[in-house]
């Protein structure tokens, strides 16, 4: 099996979930196993929990498996159901900007935050037994238990509870095409991720700060697991090229690091590629690090599974079947 990918590793663009989901689709085809996109996402999440020992949520696997072209996905992590939210207005674009400061989730930072959120629920339940998860709590309830939680657990809970509401508010703003409001929510989200959940970095904060001063930018925030990686910007399509130039220039001046930016749009999740799609895959296939012509490899194999992530980075998983 040859794996060809241009999803940046450690960029917060679901590189691990992309691999998990696409390999699952490949195995389903080989073994003739029928699986719903939702079940596939849950299976791959379990693989990351049990074999990579990373207590990740379901978001990355869910969008990689269930994503639809032209739509965002509002995920209910209790019912494991998704609601499509149209995002195909040509007047707005999404820019992904990679800080090229790779995030690291192999330490205790992520598991620590999972535990802190669980601790917050336990503390809340002493007074509010109806709270089964932080999504059930209100800001007022969290504030009332601030002393019992302590500063760190309080701020973690405050972020999660407020972020749940921001997700719902952002959905309404996007449906109404109120991009100014959606952008404000992105900025608020980033501030909370920075100050309350503490998963941002100086480089990421620099990118968001630069973006916030550019004409045509509605909003920006860190994306992915945090501790490095990428930001996403919601921008006026007419201004997209100018915004990218400003980000690249000013980020290099401020940090000495070159960032990588591209315009993207929501795309379909993992699927088996049809014969007529092969030419598109060949055109998009990158050259691997050893400089060998991967496009020749892609042309030579008869079995295809492709995955397009929400960041519009595309992974191609190809397998040469022996006769």
Model-derived regions, located:
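Short alpha-helical patches at coil-to-helix transitions and adjacent helical residues
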Residues: 17-24, 56, 114, 163-167, ...
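Glycine/serine-rich anion-binding loops at beta->alpha junctions
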Residues: 6-23, 216-234
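Hydrophobic single-pass membrane-insertion segments
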Residues: 317-323
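Gly/Ser-rich oxyanion-binding loop with an adjacent helix/lid
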Residues: 1-88, 240, 262, 268
